Amino acid sequence: MPRTRVNLQKSEANDRSFTISSLEFCLSQLRKADPNLVKKAIASGDGLTESKNDVSTRLSEAHRYSVQQCLDNSEQLAQLHNQLVHCDNVFERLQATLYSFQDNLGSIGQDMKNLQLQSHHIHQELENRQKVRVELSQFVDDIAVSQTMMKTINDTDANDRGFLEALHELHHKITLILQRGNGDAVAVNDTMPILEGLKLKAVVKVREWLLQKMFQFRKPLSNYQVFQHQLLKCRFFYEFLLHHDLISAKELQDEYIDTISKMFFTYFKAYATRLFKLAMKDVATKEDALGSIDFAKPAGLGAIFSSKQHVVRNKATVFSIGQRHQILSDDFLGALIVPHAATQNHQSYQFEALFRSIQLAFVDHYSHEYLFITDFFLVSNDEAIELHNKAMARAMSVVLKSCEEQIALSWDAISLHLCICLCDKFTEVLAEREVPEVSDYWNTVTSFLWTRLNLVMSQHYESVKSVDLKKLMHSGSLDARPHFIVRRYAELTSAHLMIAKASGKEMGAKMEAVLENSEDSIEQLLTRMSAMQQTQKNKHVFLINNYDLILSIIDNEESKHTKIYAIVHELEQKSIDDFVEEMLEPHIGYMIKFVNECESLIVQGHTQLLVRYNDKVGTVVANFNAKWRPAVDSINSECIQLFTNFSLGTTILQTIFTKYVQYINRFTKILSHDVFAKNPVCSQLVNVHQVMLEIKRFKPAY
C-alpha cells in the first residue's frame, strides 16, 4: 500500500490533470492493495506524503533491528553455515557412493545375464545327453537278447504264459530293428542272427500249437467254441506268424477254414436228419384241401387189408392257426430243439418249429463264425466275407438241401407262410448283429417257400372250384346255414392275416394276391351253392350267413383295414340289401311298385301320366291299413329264424323295418302331391308314427 501511495503522489505532483486511462490504472492498483490497509489509510485522513514518511521510518527501524539481530547471533549463524557446509560434503560423498553402487549393480546385472545364458546352455546339453541316453538305452534294450528270453523261447511250452510274453518281446525286438535299419551298429549285426534263430524256433512251436488246436475241432461231439476261445486267448500266435512267416500263416488259415467247413457240414447234416424226424404225424396232406369233403376213414374189409396207414388227426389244426403265430414273437429266439431229448420225451413239432430251430442254429453259428474270423485272422470287409463264405459254404448247401426236401413235402399253407416270415426276421437279426446278410441264401429259401405256398394254395383253389355240390345236398337241397368249407376258408384267411400282423410288417403284394385268389374261388363256390337254394330269399340268407361267418372269424382291428375284409363286407352288404327288398316284397310289394313308378314320373314332371294313379291310391291305402300290423309281426318272426347269428338277425330286422318306414314316408310324400290332394282316401292312411310305435316293440333290449 505504501507503494500505491507513492505512485499516486508522484502522479499528482507531475500532472494534476487525470485522464481516463490514468484513472483506470489507479483503480486497478487500488484493487490490488490490501483492503484493510486502504480502509485504514482513508480512515486516518493522512496524505500520501505523510504515509510515505511513516513507512520509510518504519522500514529503517526494521532494517536496523534485523542487522542488530544478525550481529547478536553471528556465532550461531557461523555455526549454522559450517553445519550446512558439512552436510553438503556428506551429501556429496553419499552421491559418489550411490553412483558407485549403481555402477556395481550394472555389472551384477550383466553377470546375471551371462550366468543365465550359461545355465541355458548347460540345461540344453543335459537334455541332449538325456535324450541320447534314453535312445541309446532303448536301442541297447531293443537289440539285447536276454538269457531268460532265449531259454523261454527254446524250452518253455507254448501253453505257458511266459512263452507268450517272450514271443511279444521277440516280435518287438525284430520289428524295431527292422524299422531302424542295421546302420553302422556292430551290435545289431551280432544280435540279428540270434533273433533270427529264435524266430525260427518260435515259428515252429507256434505253428505246431495252432495245428494241434485246430485238429481238436475234428473230434466228434466236441464243443468247437471252447477251442475257439483258446485260440482267441493266444491270438498273438497267429499274428506273429502273419508278420514273420506268411506261408505258415496262410497254411493255418486254409487248414482252419477246411476243418471248420467240414465240421459244420457234418453237424448240420446230422442235425437236420434228426430234427425233421420230429415232425408231427398229423400234419396236413394233399387230401386236406380246402374243398375236400370226405374225411372219413375207409371202413370194412378194405380198411383192414389196406396197406396204407391212416392217421386220425384233428382237422381243425389244418386251417386254424391257434397259437402257432407266437413263433414270430415270443418263441422266435427260444431255445433250439434238441433231437435226442425230444425223442426221449416223445415230443413232436409243427414244420415251422423245426424250420425255426435249424435256421436259428445256422444264424447263430454263422454270426459267431464271422466274428471269430474277423477277430482271430485280423481281416475285415471283403477279405473277411470271402473267408466266412468259404467256412460256411458246405453248411449252407446242406441246410438248403434239407429245407428244400422238407418244403417240397409240406401241404400246410400256414406253416409255409410262417417260415417265409421267419426268413425275414432272421435277416433282421443278422443285420442287428452287423453280420453279412447272405441275401442269396435267404432269397433261395424264400423262393422255395413261395413256390410251395403257391402250389398248396392253388391246390386249395382247385379243390374249391371242383367241389361236387350234389355231395353237399341233403334231401335234394342245401342248408342255408354257414358251410364248413367257408369256415375253413375263413380260418385259413384269418391265419394268414394274423401271421402278417405277428411279423410286424405290412402284407406284401404276393400274399395279397394269394388271398384275393382264395377269396375269388370261395365267392364262385358260394354263387354256385346259392343258385341251388329253392327260393330267392334262401339264396340271400345263405350268402349273408356265410359272409357273416367269414367276417366274424377275421374280425379284428388290423383285418378291418385289409382289402379282403373290404371285399367280403361289400358282398355281405349287397346281399343284405337284396334280402331286405325280398322280405318287403310279399308284404308291401304293391306300395313299393307304386312308389317307384310315381317318383319316376314326378322327377320327370309327367303330371298328366300321374293322374291315372289316382284310382290305385285307394287300393294301396286299403291294403296297407289292413295288412301292416300282421306284416310287421310276420317279418319279425321270419327274420329271426333265418340267421344263425342272433345279433346279425336283429340288425337285419332293424334294417328291414327302417326300409319299411322309408317306403311309408315316400308313399306319404307322393300323396301330398297336387294330383292326389283332392283324393279323400289319402287321409285314411295309417299314421307313420303309429307304425313306428309298433316296430319299437321288436327293438332288441341290448
Swiss-Prot record:
Acts as a component of the GARP complex that is involved in retrograde transport from early and late endosomes to the trans-Golgi network (TGN). The GARP complex facilitates tethering as well as SNARE complex assembly at the Golgi. Plays a role in the trafficking of cargo to dense-core vesicles, probably through association with the EARP-interacting protein eipr-1. Important for neuronal function. Belongs to the VPS52 family. This is Vacuolar protein sorting-associated protein 52 homolog. One of its GO terms (molecular function) is small GTPase binding. InterPro entries: Vps52 (IPR007258), Vps52_C (IPR048361), Vps52_CC (IPR048319). Its main location: Golgi. The lineage of its organism: Eukaryota, Metazoa, Ecdysozoa, Nematoda, Chromadorea. Component of the Golgi-associated retrograde protein (GARP) complex, also called VFT (VPS fifty-three) complex, composed of vps-51, vps-52, vps-53 and vps-54. Within the complex interacts with vps-53 and vps-54. Interacts with the small GTPases rab-6.1 and rab-6.2.
